[in-house]
């Protein structure tokens, strides 16, 4: 019975690292809006790339970056962009469920 469960469908994990990730030609801002920085913005970036969520991320100060939600450019001394975002997804092969 266990063999039948295993062959009924497969789940495949997908992981990808994005170094200096960009959105619309600019580095990705580490904030969606004020107060929603870090994980929410990293998750939004990963979802745009077709992944479920961000596993890890690193930030760095940068003179210019773009917010994913609004496309707004931050161009001041206090901008923070992602240096790296590692995205993760689990894909299920539905074709394997057919008899």
Model-identified regions with their sequence ranges:
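Secreted/extracellular ectodomain signature
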Residues: 11-99
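Sec-dependent N-terminal signal peptides
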Residues: 1-4
